[in-house]
Amino acid sequence: MSNSLPLRDQYLTLIDDIIQTTLKGKISSIEQVYQMLLKGITSGTGEVFELVLSDRLSIIQSQVDSETDELKKAKATRSLRAAKTIQTQWQRWQEQNKATEAISLSMREITTATADERLTALLRAIDPNQKYPLNLSQLQQLAKSLQQFATANEDFGQIAEGITHGIASWERIQVNLLNWMYEQQNTLGFGGLPGENSPWASWAKVVNSEIPQVFFRTLAVEQSALEFAQKQQGISLSNWVELTIVLQFLQRGLITWFDSYGALRYQQAYDIKAGPKLSISTFLTFAVIWSQLANGFENQAVKYSNAASQIMLQILRTFTQRPYFPLYGGIFASFSGSYLRDALDYLDAPLRSTAGTQEKARILTLLGYSQRGLGRYDRSLNFHQQALEIARNAGDKTCEIANLNHLSRTYVQQQNYSEAINYSQRALIYSRQTGDKTGEANALVNLGYSEVMEAKETEISEPEVYETAINYLEQGLKLAEKLGDLQSQALCFSSLGIAYLITAQYPTAIKYLENAFKTAQIAGDLYLQGRNLAYLAEANYHLANYEKAVYNGSLGMYLLEQIASQEWQKPASLLNIIKGQIGVDKFQLLLQQNRQKMIAIIGIDGYDYIPPLLVKYQEEM
């Protein structure tokens, strides 16, 4: 084959030569076809060959379909069979050479990029959203290839060195990846494990490289990645690449384990709520870390800032494609209140400059309902309105319906019940049209709950109004139970309990609220747990069952305050009323009688924090 021909013509000649050789009976096996392809195709040009082969197949297929002469048709059929053999062996060639192709492509992109774009090219090569991201072995090969060009450009040598050191550091961490989990069986996640008990401290002990070690120690003492960046403005390209490799593969290693059977075994042994909860926590934690690094380097090292933003968006894109992406809640299972506030603030800013995509709509959905849980209702509405528009334009009906439901819930919190009913009705219609059963269950609950709250506000006393609303709630619960959706079930039980509480049917309210609390515990939703406990306290108070009111109210107050929800003040107010009615001594006695039960849920530190929290409420009022 003449190399003076354009590449397309070279490959057309190669294909025709194989077909003609086959027709002459000179091809003895498919292996011979494969060897001819191996010899004739240049690495890195597979797309060109694939286009030429596709065109040739189409032409021959047309000849077979249109030819009327039997001899010519038979020859065309044999040619088509030969072309399909080429196609099969080409697919084999692709599979066996995709690693070489990927490395060659990455090498070419890095070495031809401008100085400011070299990191971008490297990050694109390891982006998990790509069809063939480089794995550790391929990265090692890439580093060796780049090292050969180090004399031509110092950056290539630094990138190669960073990759090599990063892989070595990750391999040291990998064998000790989960030690911290088994040492801290009752406290998982990344918010709320300070000092030597944190995963960061655990990894700092085993990594044998300065920059990753300093980074992990910074986070272990509850400083942020932003503070690390501000102290590392002169970080070398090699060190930056090393840290990138370590953090990228650390995050992926954690996610792989949390999504695996290993996590299932851990759940069975220690914590039934672990798997998805920890995966969600990991995705968001590392997204926040990269956002903070982007922020920290934006003034002095723009290329590092841009690279960090690129990684953050890659992580979020991967996260939104997971089946457990929490469209309807659950984030409060993974973070303490202060950590969550930081996460929301850091994820908000970079998303503003990102194009409107399905991924962005889903992240905005998460930000929206999280802001609602924190009591930031205007911000919640803003996020959900943005997400609604983007999801609609992206054709993501599931996300669109979720945001209609969330808008309904947020308007209920603002006591704008007509808007809440409007959005829940729209969600119900769309969910039934599209067959979104989870969306339908949530819409039924939101509609029933909104109507109960509106009837209460307008002081409607007709029982049929409440019966209709409660019927919606019961339909939603039945559907959620059928789906096995714990998050939606918890919301259904809770909404039914509140509806019966509002209508003064206290024993029935308690039954549903207790179920709501238990289901929220299994789902791992701290916000719903705290909220249900607060309403249980109110229901028991109305029945003059002060012991249970104090028990539930104290737990609810503590859990809500821990996630920074302003709703903690509601049970705090009730507890102060009870204390005033029964006296301080009796109140303290009721707390003491339930001490062991409360410690089992919130620990000794949580129990000891209840009296100071009540004092805090009184001081703030």
What is each residue range found by the language model?
Residues 449-461, 537-548, 575-594:
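Alpha-helical linker/edge segments of TPR/alpha-solenoid repeat scaffolds
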Residues 1-356, 584-621:
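Flexible inter-repeat linkers and adjacent short helices
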Residues 331-347, 376-385, 420-425, 463-475, ...:
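Helix-turn-helix repeat elements of alpha-solenoid scaffolds
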Residues 353-355, 390-396, 432-436, 478-485, ...:
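Short coil/turn linkers that connect adjacent helices within long alpha-helical scaffolds
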Residues 364-367, 371, 383, 400-411, ...:
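TPR/Sel1-like alpha-solenoid repeat signature
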Residues 308, 312, 353-362, 380, ...:
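Residues that mark the junctions of alpha-helical repeat units in TPR/alpha-solenoid scaffolds
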